[in-house]
Amino acid sequence: MIISSASDYREAARRRVPPFMFHYADGGSYAEQTLARNVSDLENIALRQRVLKDMSELDTSIELFGEKLSMPTILAPVGACGMYARRGEVQAAQAADNKGVPFTLSTVSICPIEEVAPAIKRPMWFQLYVLKDRGFMKNALERAKAAGCSTLVFTVDMPTPGARYRDMHSGMSGPYKEIRRVLQGFTHPFWAYDVGIKGKPHTLGNVSTYMGRQIGLDDYIGWLTENFDPSISWKDLEWIREFWEGPMVIKGILDPEDAKDAVRFGADGIVVSNHGGRQLDGVLSSARALPPIADAVKGDIKIIADSGIRNGLDIVRMLALGADATMLGRAFVYALGAAGRQGVENMLDIFKKEMHVAMTLTSNRTIADIKPEALVDLSKL
């Protein structure tokens, strides 16, 4: 099929990737209301067009935690990313590296830290959950440091997993899931060969290395469910702050008071995120949550925003709402599932071109120029 926009990759991935993996990325929790609002709330934000300004020298680059980024975005941590393309985390990391943006490796990646880090030139970021098994956390941090990971992304909005009903229907979970996945592989032969056969082993690389045995896809949800820690508090993060010398970002902030706590804690950044609508359904979209958080802590801590970003215009919207940078999750997974590394590189090119158009027609030469004034206050119309 013809790919003319990043959204086309979703349809391409739906055709190529078996349902149990496509819907794992595409779906949200419960009735998926927050998942829908993440997208619609961004779409409904109007940009303020300004013309007859000299926009011949336009710059989308930023500096974040001492790193130069070609555009204000980071590839977000996505679990089991290696099931969307052969050794998918490596391909996505190489695409990000080639386009000058960071890649964040998930705790529950298929490819382990030691496989991904040597495949790229720039340091990758590493994402970690708060888990009951503190030994695993310490081991993961030590390995991330040894591999040269530059920034730690600490996900705090998963003390318990959300209920993802769509996974029950698709075969990711639910009755007869194993045989349903096998049958789906027969109807998706290219994926079955490229990922199912050539992409082995299908284990959680970081977990398997620590456990000394293979932890596969069937163990994935069970292992996470058993290890999520509902007793987590800011105090539990103190030993990590002492252990990790580099930048530390707290992911999963939706309330200004939590953002202030992150500043007091000494975090270097936060990610305003509802986990892509995959945790508590019914919470605010990131676009709605972002402005009051920016009012509370802008300038005291770096603000990254994710959830609902589907094009370069959405990145500009998030920046105008108060973010310093953004994270892309589903957008790059669709591209990865559809066309591997090349797909992710092309998707990033598309996003950057769309940013150029939006910045030109809102008369913002640099990322620092993008302020709330780039938006139209529809309540006054």
Swiss-Prot record:
Keyword Oxidoreductase listed? The answer is yes
* Residues binding FMN: 106, 127, 155, 251, 306-330
Superkingdom is Bacteria
- Active site as annotated: H275
What EC numbers are recorded for this enzyme? 1.1.-.-
The entry lists its GO molecular-function terms as: FMN binding; L-lactate dehydrogenase activity
Residues in FMN hydroxy acid dehydrogenase domain copies: 1-380
The prosthetic group or cofactor this protein requires is: FMN
The Gene Ontology CC terms held by the record are:
plasma membrane
Q: Which SUPFAM superfamilies match?
A: FMN-linked oxidoreductases
Instruction: Kindly give the membrane topology term recorded for this protein.
Output: Peripheral membrane protein
Q: What class of enzyme is it?
A: oxidoreductase
Question: Its Gene Ontology biological processes?
Answer: aerobic respiration; lactate metabolic process
Major localization listed first in the record, in broad terms: membrane
Q: Where does the UniProt annotation locate this protein?
A: Cell inner membrane
PROSITE patterns, A to Z:
FMN_HYDROXY_ACID_DH_1, FMN_HYDROXY_ACID_DH_2
InterPro entries, per database record: Aldolase_TIM, Alpha-hydoxy_acid_DH_FMN, FMN-dep_DH, FMN_HAD, FMN_hydac_DH_AS, LldD
Q: Quote the catalytic activity from the record.
A: (S)-lactate + A = pyruvate + AH2
Alphabetized Pfam families for the sequence: FMN_dh
Keywords (alphabetical) are:
Cell inner membrane, Cell membrane, Flavoprotein, FMN, Membrane, Oxidoreductase
* NCBIfam families recorded: L_lactate_LldD, PRK11197.1
Job description of the protein? Catalyzes the conversion of L-lactate to pyruvate. Is coupled to the respiratory chain.
Entry similarity comment: Belongs to the FMN-dependent alpha-hydroxy acid dehydrogenase family.
> What is the name of the protein in this document?
L-lactate dehydrogenase
Species of provenance: Haemophilus influenzae (strain PittGG)
